[in-house]
């Protein structure tokens, strides 16, 4: 039966029994003759994770009331009279503490006021003020031309040598340079100049606070950082500063814990969902629920996006399993059948698949149908055609990669990336997030189809996620050639060494970020919060793959951050 032809109240959203249509023995293909996945089991205790849904946390009514009071204090502070540079620095601190979402309108209002102010003496000639102003305005959708930095160049067109001693100015210039577009050569020069000089002085900076900020920035620029992860680090860092604003710090801690308590309940419910699917018993695929929840928090940590996180985590966990079926477990014939079932969005033919794979297919259908049912109930919009199309497109890209591997075909880098920017899978999660958050008056079949068509913003998001994923591939994996990656494609195509290939891919990352930065200012039918989701998924990838594959294998850095962001609340002083 074709799912599109059924009634929304019957088979369209019908939950399929995971025991239905599964051949008892004929489809029970033994795993004995299949390649071993060698995936490590999850290091997370799922009984503990499930308990988070009901466990009382440290956030009580007293703390909630206190947070509300402090929020008003901070709001008054932001609207107060102060020097322009001090106002910019306050906004910067508020954003880095993870509080931007609480003061969105106030931040835009204050920045626009500073932008419209005809007096420019306060920032012209001051590298720190010029760069901080440039970055904050561009971050918040107000365009500033790159030529504001021309004044810091000498007659030969180079950045003035005396700027090498201005560490704070260099740090602000470094952060600003990551907001550049294609063709903005001055910002490219600024990035190179600031990076070189900060690396030269990072071990000899007299101020411990400034030294830590410089090293942190060189490890990962702000524009590439996930807001929630950055906030957890910066709250501790801000507490060390001499000029800390006590009530702002207190509010940041309270708000972090309030949001964390919401995330914990969501995580507990998702852990229960995962166990109830029975997929945790399948030994040939990865269990990545926790990693996907961390990614969900990178994509949209704000409390109002609970449904976005819920869908993203469920889809992400299933996507990983489907990816493992195509990469490791399934035969080419099974993958053809799998792809056909998803393309038709019809479970007829599932009896031709082994039971393990059939369970994954049925869970895919059940989860997509449940998400679609919720959207129809809550928003009056039939999303099944769009979610089904996104799943089908994804599976077709997986199948193409599987055929490349089985036939020994070596695609060019361009050919690989054209397929890979979709096979990285974020289009599916982004389409679903769009359906959940787009304003109802703008949500139409055509608008959803536009997102599914992979427009430029979504394309850059997919490309960057793909490139980061590939850079996380180990040298051993590349040498084995188990899975096709962009690094291998470039090596095969050009004869380059792995080191040279990695540098080339890193260069593509910088160029793709410039394209995405430009997209944020172009006229488009896409709007917030969807635009932000596209950028934030990339920031999640940057974290997981920065030091290797922290997604497939729970490394110490990913587990430590997961504990501090999701499990352990920030300690409050006794008087708090």
Curated annotation (Swiss-Prot):
Keyword Lyase attributed: yes
Documented EC number(s): 4.2.3.-
Residue numbers binding Mg(2+) 1: 323, 327
Parts forming coiled coils: none
Binding, Mg(2+) 3: 469, 473, 477
Renumbered ranges of motif DDXXD motif: 323-327
Cofactor(s) of this protein: Mg(2+); Mn(2+)
Keywords per UniProt: Lyase, Magnesium, Manganese, Metal-binding
Sequence positions that bind (2E,6E)-farnesyl diphosphate: 286, 323, 327, 466, 469
Biological process, per Gene Ontology: diterpenoid biosynthetic process
Keyword Secreted attached: no
Gene3D superfamilies reported in the protein's UniProt record: Farnesyl Diphosphate Synthase (1.10.600.10), Terpene synthase, N-terminal domain (1.50.10.130)
Family matches, as Pfam families: Terpene_synth, Terpene_synth_C
Gene Ontology molecular functions: magnesium ion binding; terpene synthase activity
Residues the entry annotates as binding Mg(2+) 2: 323, 327
Enzyme class: lyase
Cofactor note: Binds 3 Mg(2+) or Mn(2+) ions per subunit.
Description of its domains: The Asp-Asp-Xaa-Xaa-Asp/Glu (DDXXD/E) motif is important for the catalytic activity, presumably through binding to Mg(2+).
Family the entry assigns: Belongs to the terpene synthase family. Tpsb subfamily.
Task of the protein: Produces a mixture of beta-bisabolene and alpha-bisabolol, along with traces of alpha-bisabolene and farnesene isomers from (2E,6E)-farnesyl diphosphate in fragrance biosynthesis.
Protein name per the record: Alpha-bisabolol synthase
Organism expressing this protein natively: Santalum spicatum
């Amino acid at each position: 039966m074709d799912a599109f032809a059924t009634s929304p109240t019957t088979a369209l959203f019908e939950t399929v029994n995971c025991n239905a249509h599964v051949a008892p023995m004929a489809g029970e293909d033994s795993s004995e003759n299949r390649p071993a996945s060698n995936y490590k089991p999850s290091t997370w205790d799922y009984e503990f994770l499930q308990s988070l849904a009901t466990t009382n946390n440290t956030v009580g009514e007293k703390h909630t009331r206190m947070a509300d009071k402090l929020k008003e204090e901070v709001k008054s502070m932001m609207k107060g009279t102060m020097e322009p540079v001090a106002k910019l620095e306050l906004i910067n601190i508020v954003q880095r503490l993870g509080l931007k979402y609480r003061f969105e309108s106030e931040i835009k209002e204050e920045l626009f006021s500073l932008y419209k102010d005809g007096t420019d003496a306060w920032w012209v000639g001051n590298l720190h003020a010029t760069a901080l102003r440039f970055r904050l305005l561009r971050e918040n959708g107000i365009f500033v031309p790159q030529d504001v930095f021309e004044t810091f160049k000498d007659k030969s067109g180079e950045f003035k040598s005396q700027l090498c001693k201005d560490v704070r100015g260099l740090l602000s210039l470094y952060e600003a340079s990551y907001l550049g577009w294609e063709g903005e050569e001055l910002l490219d020069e600024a990035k190179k100049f600031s990076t070189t000089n900060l690396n030269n002085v990072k071990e000899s900076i007299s101020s411990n606070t400034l030294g830590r900020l410089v090293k942190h920035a060189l490890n990962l620029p702000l524009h590439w950082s996930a807001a929630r992860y950055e906030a957890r680090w910066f709250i501790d860092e801000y507490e060390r500063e001499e000029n800390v604003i006590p009530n702002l710090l207190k509010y940041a801690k309270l708000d972090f814990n309030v949001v964390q308590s919401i995330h914990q309940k969501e995580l507990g419910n998702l852990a229960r969902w995962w166990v109830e699917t029975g997929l945790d018993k399948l030994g040939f695929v990865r269990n990545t629920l926790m990693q996907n929840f961390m990614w969900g928090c990178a994509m949209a940590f704000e409390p109002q996006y609970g449904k976005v996180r819920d869908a993203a985590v469920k889809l992400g966990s299933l996507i990983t399993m489907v990816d493992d079926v195509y990469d490791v477990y399934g035969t080419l014939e099974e993958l053809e059948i799998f792809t056909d079932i998803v393309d038709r969005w019809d479970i007829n033919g599932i009896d031709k698949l082994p039971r393990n794979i059939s369970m994954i297919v049925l869970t895919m259908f059940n989860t997509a149908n449940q998400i679609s049912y919720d959207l129809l109930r809550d928003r009056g919009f039939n999303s099944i055609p769009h979610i089904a199309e996104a799943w089908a497109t994804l599976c077709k890209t997986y199948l193409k990669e599987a055929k490349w591997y089985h036939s020994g075909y070596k695609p060019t880098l361009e050919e690989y990336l054209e397929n890979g920017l979709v096979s990285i899978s974020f289009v599916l999660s982004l389409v679903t997030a769009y359906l959940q958050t787009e304003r109802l008056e703008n949500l139409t079949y055509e608008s959803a189809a536009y997102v599914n068509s992979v427009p430029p913003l979504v394309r850059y998001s997919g490309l960057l996620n793909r490139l980061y994923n590939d850079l996380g591939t180990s040298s051993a994996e590349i040498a084995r050639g188990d899975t096709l990656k962009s690094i291998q494609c470039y090596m095969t195509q050009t004869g380059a060494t792995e080191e040279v290939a990695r540098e080339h891919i890193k260069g593509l990352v910088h160029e793709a970020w410039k394209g995405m930065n430009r997209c944020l200012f172009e006229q488009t039918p896409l709007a917030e919060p969807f635009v932000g989701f596209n950028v934030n998924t990339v920031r999640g990838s940057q974290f997981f793959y920065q030091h290797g594959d922290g997604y497939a294998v729970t490394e110490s850095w990913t587990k430590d951050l997961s504990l501090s962001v999701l499990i352990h609340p920030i300690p409050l002083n006794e008087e708090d």
